[in-house]
Amino acid sequence: MKNWTDVIGKEKEQPYFQHALQQVHLARANGKTIYPPQEEVFNAFKYTAFEDVKVVILGQDPYHGANQAHGLAFSVKPEVAIPPSLLNMYKELTQDISGFQMPSNGYLVKWAEQGVLLLNTVLTVERGMAHSHANLGWERFTDKVIAVLNEHREKLVFLLWGSHAQKKGQIIDRTRHLVLTAPHPSPLSAHRGFFGCHHFSKTNSYLESNGMKPIDWQI
């Protein structure tokens, strides 16, 4: 049984990774507000063990508003308003999954604990400045995460929404994993094919057909 340390532990010793950590540390030390809080940056890996991953949902960078980001892509803390992209994911779920009720919060830990890796491709952001940490080196790290999942695991489902996620997912072996693509669920693009994509039910059909327990998407 491999764990995250086995497959990506050495990345943390790489100069690029140390540089990313150092830049984030310096920004915080200089009084900048960086999201998520330091202890939550790697939450995606804490909530979903390597051997437990069944589904990978790729986000871009963390939410940059106060108290939103907590280290899981698309997820927000329970007391925070549900962001528009996640609201659209919930709307699709109400159409796609029989009996799904519109949740009152956007806290997706329940998904993560069932094996849904909610991975942002950039792990930090400065308050109010989307993509402000896009060039720190996080992309290289998350490319490695995708590569080790592709290589060491079988029959995963990758949900790639929007061109950024789809580009990141080009290395995935589609003969060994299910890759589902759609426009991003943001209000700008959801109507171009995210609504009606049925990715949540397709994910569960694939898991069940391969002898795995489906995801209970209800939050």
Curated annotation (Swiss-Prot):
The keyword ATP-binding appears for this protein: no
Catalytic activity: Hydrolyzes single-stranded DNA or mismatched double-stranded DNA and polynucleotides, releasing free uracil
PROSITE patterns, A to Z: U_DNA_GLYCOSYLASE
Compartment(s): Cytoplasm
EC numbers, comma separated: 3.2.2.27
GO-annotated biological processes: base-excision repair, AP site formation via deaminated base removal
UniProt-listed Pfam families: UDG (PF03167)
Major site of localization recorded for this protein: cytoplasm
Family: Belongs to the uracil-DNA glycosylase (UDG) superfamily. UNG family.
Protein name as annotated: Uracil-DNA glycosylase
